[in-house]
């Protein structure tokens, strides 16, 4: 039985690696979950005329990644990713129990660790924030915490003597979205952004939105 699963795992990995570049699925985003679903034999069928016995199980297995990864298992039409490179797309999430003091301590001064620390004005972060609703929800939370924020212009800087800075951390190497979340949690980050080329960005407590939309992972740029 164990050898059976090993064979299935190797087969699913080979399947993903052999997809043509022009029509391949987003391997960085999908490989882990697609392999899991293929090993469980939940995505083995193909849609036919009025008959797809495994489609529902496959969709449930892929979960939130269905839209991005259904072409990897032959359930929807292949996409051409040349028009939208993985570095231009990302997944973001708030972490439930951030530790601001830990994050600040780990990002102060120069470090010899495998990451890159980047700081920039909060106003710059807000100038390209991608979701106004998310921002307004954050502003509402900050009001309850008695933090002063601009009330009439989302692009305005914070009214303080020293402009507030947003600090983020980019890990040098590529990693899965699961590992990105764990790594950011372990350093006390408030949020994380996982680019679809597998670059991981941990976002500090001073940031209002979701940090920077620019990939800056040293060994994971494309």
Swiss-Prot record:
Q: Which InterPro entries match?
A: Tsg
A Pfam family name for this chain? Tsg_N
Q: What tissue expression does the UniProt record report for this protein?
A: Expressed in lymph node, liver, kidney, and lung. Expression in the kidney was stronger in the medulla than in the cortex, particularly in the cells surrounding the medullary tubules. Expressed in growth plate cartilage of long bones, ribs, and digits and to a lesser extent also in the resting zone of the epiphysis, trabecular bone, and vertebral cartilage. Expression seems to be absent from other skeletal tissues including muscle, skin, and fibroblasts.
The knockout outcome noted for this protein's gene is: Embryonic lethality and sirenomelia were observed only in BMP null embryos in which one or two copies of TSG were also missing. When TSG and BMP7 are mutated, the siren phenotype results from the fusion of the limb buds in the ventroposterior midline owing to a paucity of posterior ventral mesoderm.
* A GO biological-process term: camera-type eye development
Which molecular function term from Gene Ontology is one that the record holds? heparin binding
Its function, per the record, reads: May be involved in dorsoventral axis formation. Seems to antagonize BMP signaling by forming ternary complexes with CHRD and BMPs, thereby preventing BMPs from binding to their receptors. In addition to the anti-BMP function, also has pro-BMP activity, partly mediated by cleavage and degradation of CHRD, which releases BMPs from ternary complexes. May be an important modulator of BMP-regulated cartilage development and chondrocyte differentiation. May play a role in thymocyte development.
Return the domain comment text from this UniProt entry: The N-terminal domain is sufficient to interact with BMP4.
Protein name in UniProt: Twisted gastrulation protein homolog 1
Task: Please spell out the taxonomic lineage of the organism that makes this protein.
Answer: Eukaryota, Metazoa, Chordata, Craniata, Vertebrata
């Amino acid at each position: 039985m164990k050898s059976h699963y090993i064979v299935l795992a190797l087969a699913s990995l080979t399947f993903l690696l052999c997809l043509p570049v022009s029509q391949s699925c987003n391997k960085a985003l999908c490989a882990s979950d697609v392999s899991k679903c293929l090993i469980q034999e939940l995505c083995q069928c193909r849609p036919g005329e009025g008959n797809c016995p495994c489609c529902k199980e496959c969709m449930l297995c892929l979960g939130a990644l269905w839209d991005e990864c259904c072409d990897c298992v032959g359930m929807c039409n292949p996409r051409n990713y040349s028009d939208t490179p993985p570095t231009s797309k990302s997944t973001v999430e708030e972490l439930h129990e951030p530790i601001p003091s830990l994050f600040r301590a780990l990002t102060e001064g120069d470090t010899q660790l495998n990451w890159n620390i980047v700081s920039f004005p909060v106003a710059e972060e807000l100038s390209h924030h991608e979701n106004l609703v998310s921002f307004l929800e954050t502003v509402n939370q900050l009001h309850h915490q008695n933090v002063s924020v601009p009330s009439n212009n989302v692009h305005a800087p914070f009214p303080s003597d020293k402009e507030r800075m947003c600090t983020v951390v980019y890990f040098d190497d590529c990693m899965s979205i699961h590992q990105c979340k764990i790594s950011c949690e372990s350093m006390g980050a408030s949020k994380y952004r996982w680019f679809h080329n597998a670059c991981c960005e941990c976002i500090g407590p001073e940031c209002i939105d979701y940090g920077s939309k620019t990939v800056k992972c040293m060994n994971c740029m494309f």
